[in-house]
Amino acid sequence: LGPTNPGAQSVDALASGNVRAFQLYTNTDIEIKSLGFGVGLSKKLPSNFEVSANYNYAQFDFDQSKDPSFEAGFNTPKHRVKASISNDNLFKNFGFNVSARWSDEYMWESSFADGMIDEVTVIDAQISYGIPSLKSILKVGATNLGGTEYRQLLGPGLIGQQYFVSLTINP
């Protein structure tokens, strides 16, 4: 037999698909700067209306050239916003809630895939009906009313619409 050539063995293994992939998670000695904050406001308005909004900011910086093999996996959009308007008693026993969520594009890094997650705006809504005789509330609603499928990470499937009905007894 003679000496083995690890380089040739590696090339042969890659060419034939005879490999097992794995991810080794490590830290890094390079300087990493991160900053984040969130702020939310809510205001009751006349006639039982309420508006609310929140904003989240997340920033993560480091010099990739100082450690090219380091994969941060921060996986968070820099900007996220949510706003809603609601009224739990718009008229006798009826209420509603409509909200909009937005996030900008961001880089997704993981052991199985790296790539950009697109900017997305999603609108959700629900109506509610109070049933005083049963001390209950019936809610009917939907998420992602626009119907455009979107993703929040790489790997799993796309997120579509979801419809729901709930009955809360003795709220």
Question: What name fits each language-model region?
Answer:
Residues 50, 56, 72-171:
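Conserved C-terminal beta-signal and adjacent last beta-strands/turns
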